[in-house]
């Protein structure tokens, strides 16, 4: 059965069902938001020197592709000792670097037009494309360095913000909440579970959950016990995807995680009619663009747990790193997450209204037709030595216990609730338009400039670029070392960032900003065009030096001990191509992981 979808042509919105097309009335089309990305407000300019390298790559591509092991040729920047330089170059990706080649088979250091080359190890997508395996599901995330040299049809739609059907709940407000409250600041892997567990166990009436992934067995057991031993009502909306390791990935931090179908079945058996679960609708023409990415739980309409991290063992490990005997070398294996528990009935009621609306929307708006099951993604082989390198290098790591701050009627705290697609752009643009006085610390899983950003996304990036180049400011940026990391760094340089102020961190899943040691933004918003505009995410903005200082200390620790200015390109994963599976010695030298372990969540 074909699937209905929304499309736009010539400013007119249609419902496409198979080969049939129905035009929407203008008043119906007008309520669909955000505006289609077919009308971008800004096109990122390409630096002239980089444009010359891109042209050189086009000119000499055929010649270079004839050389041994070469799988792709493009324009980009040279790297030296794993660090990006400002020198544009023709980047030649190879399956592996070979020694002792005859001169005629070697990649020249400089091309006939004077452009230098830089040889790198091909990423999994480049390897698959060289094997003739092409699929939208195995493509890279939309990145500026790729888009500015892609053929027109290939570039169209990359990181487009699609038409969505989201409408906020009637009568709800995201106004700042001011009053007596308490906030418990904490982070993972240090103390995430030690705070989340009692938060759940202290429920007496109901829990309302919005969550991207729920697979951790210890969280399941805690919820199961709660529902078995009480009359608590549980209502949850989940994202429609899950990320689990392969059965033979014994070293995965999620090796014992459960499929969400099993989680739902088990909780249904215990709580019966007291348990309700649904999946949000994501995709073009649906409620949210590409992800129900929120991580919020409301307990008894009185307390809110809000986080950057999912309910997976990689985000919420069942370990006590505050124990002096704990093995702190395990810290880099887990995700860095920022969490907060806020005891405020008013704030809890605000988020609860939106989460209940998400649930009702998913339940009352059935999918039209059945989606075809997507093709399975290939697994990846990751060098074991690279993974051990992270553990061996984990020296001098600190752990951070939770910190609780209480506020009364005489000294109330103000908290700004933030949701996408609702008010993130309004709040965060207003925040960043005010130049910091001294410092800005940015830590996020994603930081992905694109060729044709929407106007608001373009302004967010422009402001961060501007501050990164302001010598009077202490600006530091950390994002996750995952996926095509070289292409990401090249995209940031092409967008104008000061690369001396950027580091990458394994397992960085935080989405936070600290400004002037006084203001903190934390939550689940990835810095992508869809992440700030059209997915479902939640964050908080708080002006308070002690609260901001807590997260700032964690940031500075990560900057000094876990983040790196250089990357290790030789550690690039290798895709397991169907029919070419490996065994034997490679099972010892490599760890087999799912494709999702290489891509952003």
Place the predicted regions along the sequence by residue:
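HKD-type phospholipase D/PLD-like phosphodiesterase module
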Residues: 146-203, 213-434, 469-519, 525-540, ...
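Long, C-terminal catalytic modules of enzymes
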Residues: 309, 518-601
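Charged helix-capping and loop-helix junction motifs
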Residues: 455-462
């Amino acid at each position: 059965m074909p699937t209905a979808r929304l499309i736009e042509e010539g400013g007119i919105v249609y419902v496409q069902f198979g080969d049939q097309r129905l035009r929407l009335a203008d008043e119906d089309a007008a309520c669909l938001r955000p505006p289609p990305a077919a009308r971008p407000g800004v096109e990122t300019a390409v630096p002239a020197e980089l444009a010359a390298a891109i042209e050189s790559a086009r000119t000499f591509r055929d010649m270079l592709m004839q050389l041994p092991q070469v799988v792709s040729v493009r324009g980009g920047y040279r790297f030296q000792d794993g660090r990006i330089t400002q020198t544009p170059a023709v980047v030649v990706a190879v399956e592996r670097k070979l020694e002792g080649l005859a001169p005629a088979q070697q990649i020249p250091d400089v091309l006939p037009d004077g452009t230098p080359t830089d040889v790198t190890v091909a990423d999994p997508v480049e390897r698959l494309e060289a094997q003739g395996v092409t699929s939208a599901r195995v493509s890279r995330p939309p990145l500026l360095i790729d888009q500015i040299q892609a053929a027109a049809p290939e570039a169209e739609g990359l990181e487009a913000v699609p038409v969505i059907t989201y409408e906020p709940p009637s009568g709800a407000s995201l106004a700042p909440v001011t009053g007596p409250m308490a906030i418990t600041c904490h982070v993972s892997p240090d103390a995430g579970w030690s705070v989340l567990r009692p938060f759940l166990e202290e429920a007496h009436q109901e829990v309302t959950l919005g969550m991207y992934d729920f697979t951790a067995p210890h969280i399941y057991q805690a919820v199961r016990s709660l529902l078995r031993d009480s009359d608590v009502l549980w209502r949850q909306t989940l994202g429609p995807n899950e990320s689990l390791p392969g059965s033979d990935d014994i070293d995965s931090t999620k090796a014992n995680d459960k499929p969400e179908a099993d989680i739902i079945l088990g909780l249904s058996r215990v709580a019966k009619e007291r348990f309700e679960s649904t999946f949000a609708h994501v995709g073009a023409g649906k409620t949210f663009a590409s992800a129900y990415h929120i991580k919020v739980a409301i307990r008894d309409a009185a307390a809110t747990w809000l986080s950057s991290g999912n309910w997976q063992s990689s985000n919420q490990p069942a370990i006590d790193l505050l124990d002096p005997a704990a093995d702190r070398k395990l810290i880099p294996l887990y995700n860095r997450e920022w969490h907060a528990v806020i005891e405020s009935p008013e704030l809890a009621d605000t988020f609860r209204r939106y989460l209940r609306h998400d649930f009702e929307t998913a339940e009352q708006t059935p999918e039209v037709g059945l989606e075809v099951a997507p093709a399975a993604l290939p697994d990846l082989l990751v060098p074991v030595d690279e993974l051990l390198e992270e553990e061996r290098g984990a020296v001098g790591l600190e752990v951070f216990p939770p910190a609780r701050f209480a506020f009364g009627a005489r000294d109330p705290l103000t908290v700004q609730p933030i949701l996408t697609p609702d008010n993130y752009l309004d709040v965060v643009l207003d925040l960043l338009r005010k130049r910091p006085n001294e410092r800005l610390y940015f830590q996020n899983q994603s930081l992905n400039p694109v060729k044709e950003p929407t106007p608001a996304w373009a302004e967010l990036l422009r402001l961060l670029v501007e501050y990164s180049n302001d010598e009077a400011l202490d600006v530091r940026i950390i994002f996750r070392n995952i996926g095509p990391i070289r292409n990401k760094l090249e995209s940031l340089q092409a967008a104008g960032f000061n690369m001396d102020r950027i580091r990458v961190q394994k397992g960085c899943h935080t989405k936070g900003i600290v400004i002037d040691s006084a203001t903190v933004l934390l939550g689940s918003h990835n810095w992508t065009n869809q992440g700030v505009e059209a997915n479902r995410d939640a964050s908080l903005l708080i002006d308070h030096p002690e609260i901001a200082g807590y997260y700032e200390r964690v940031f500075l620790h990560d900057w000094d001990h876990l983040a790196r200015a250089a990357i290790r390109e030789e550690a690039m994963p290798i895709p397991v191509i169907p029919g070419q599976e490996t065994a034997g010695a490679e099972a010892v030298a490599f760890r087999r992981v799912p494709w999702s372990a290489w891509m952003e969540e």
